[in-house]
């Protein structure tokens, strides 16, 4: 995706069937079970930043106004979860003391957003602590988000987050997406669905994690209100679309709802 001075990939497409899009930018066996580690070499102008999955291990000065960043993902991950973003980003950094180690927190934001990052991501450490307590140590290298113009996507170490969510306030809407994408680190990224027909499990677990976290912090009334909305939607709409399916091999056009 190109947008002004920014270029990035998104690992899934809502309207693509199947949804996984590793094959759109590198040769691969683009299924959910053929996992691999990655080395990425990104050559960019000196005044730009790259953000990819894994860790930035080295930057080479090419002597011609460009540099090459070397990113390494040591964990084996599915093809749709590897990613890159390049642009006129400003990097905001923090750390979170996890169960086993200190984990970097990175946010790659546009220059006009950087002053809004800290307030927007106020609860990020609380999300990480909650999920680690419930599901075990954070399984990847860093907690990292990059501002993009199109949607949200749980790439390993490089979550695409809609720039419209970086508002300078910690609110329910931004917290929902920040925590939702983080929870995929355990459900979707570490443990991945076996095929496209079961991709709804990735989203189902992440939706559960949202409700689990918010119920813990806002109480049972929040949970019952949210579940009530979902039940109302089912009662009001599913009969019109015959919207019922067995809980496996779901049609791909309803993976995301």
At which residue positions do the language-model features occur?
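Acidic/His-enriched low-complexity segments
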Residues: 1-139
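Hydrophobic alpha-helical and helix-loop surface patches within well-folded domains
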Residues: 71, 104-257
């Amino acid at each position: 995706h190109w947008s002004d001075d920014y270029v990035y990939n998104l690992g899934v497409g809502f309207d693509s069937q199947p949804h996984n899009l590793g094959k759109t930018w590198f040769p691969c066996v683009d299924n959910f079970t053929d996992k691999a580690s990655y080395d990425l070499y990104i050559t960019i102008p000196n005044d730009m930043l790259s953000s990819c999955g894994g860790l930035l291990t080295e930057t080479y000065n090419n002597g011609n106004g460009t540099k090459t960043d070397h990113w390494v993902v040591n964990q084996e991950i599915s093809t749709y979860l590897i990613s890159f973003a390049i642009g006129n980003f400003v990097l905001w950094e923090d750390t979170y003391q996890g169960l086993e180690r200190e984990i970097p927190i990175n946010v790659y934001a546009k220059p006009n957003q950087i002053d809004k990052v800290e307030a927007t991501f106020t609860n990020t450490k609380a999300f990480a602590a909650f999920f680690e307590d419930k599901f075990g140590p954070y399984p990847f290298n860093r907690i990292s988000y990059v501002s993009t113009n199109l949607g949200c996507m749980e790439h390993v170490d490089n979550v695409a987050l809609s720039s419209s969510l970086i508002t300078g306030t910690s609110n329910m809407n931004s917290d929902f997406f920040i925590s939702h994408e983080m929870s995929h680190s355990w459900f979707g990224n570490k443990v991945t669905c076996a095929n496209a027909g079961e991709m709804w499990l990735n989203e189902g677990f992440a939706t559960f994690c949202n409700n689990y976290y918010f119920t813990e912090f806002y109480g049972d009334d929040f949970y019952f209100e949210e579940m009530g909305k979902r039940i109302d939607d089912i009662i009001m709409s599913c009969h019109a679309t015959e919207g019922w399916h067995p809980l496996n091999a779901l049609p791909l056009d309803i993976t995301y709802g």
